[in-house]
């Protein structure tokens, strides 16, 4: 319990640091110029899993590319609010995204149990000069890290309203 509380306090403090104005008055959170911040790619499986890519930019613009087993194939665009983008970045921060391994697949420490024929979700975050990407194989089970990533991926989809293009 004490360890969880300590982790929560550290995560909250780290999040506050991300959103404090810089000394020159410029916002230290979301960059003003349009840069790629978050990506989510859902890959093929043995079946009819939706295959698509999302890119979220610092100005809230969303680019979608539908590939297979989706309602909308090809390109589409959308938009999320600055607040939604900040909340998504906070979700990445809360799970210590930059500290997680680049690949979670059968045989790795974070994949104690693995099943075949599942899709992967590949996420990335570019934030405050750092960039990290994680290939999360959805056939992996048995680790809290997996559930945290799955929830993060679902929150990205929800913020963007990906269902408008995939269902």
Positions of PLM-derived features:
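Bacterial N-terminal signal peptides
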Residues: 9-18
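Beta-turn initiation residues at beta-strand->coil junctions
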Residues: 64-67
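Short, well-ordered, aromatic-rich surface patches in folded extracellular/luminal domains
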Residues: 2-6, 22-46, 52, 70-72, ...
